């Protein structure tokens, strides 16, 4: 198993976002991790598709989009149109996780599943063979 380096856009300087993305483009990072938060599933709000679209135009690294939102399945096609390589959804946010994973794959992306700290890993038993990545929140 290879260790992947995926810096988060949330650590960037939002006043000079393009410079930080260009720095990541020149780095040895494997991916760029984008945390999308809606203020409902999680208490914070980060950014949405206008920012994702702008980032996708200047970033040369594969995009790993992590949705910390309710109903992430509503944004699969829009995320694929950005050219995202990976779409990460929370187990706790998906009513039909297996269907969501299949839809992500059908849209041409890899599918990641994220677990909140209080969620036992055993909940992934039925779908673990279908996911490309598991992200454990801390």
Task: Identify the meaning behind each predicted range.
Residues 114-138:
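Histidine/lysine/aspartate-rich catalytic loop segments that bind and position anionic ligands
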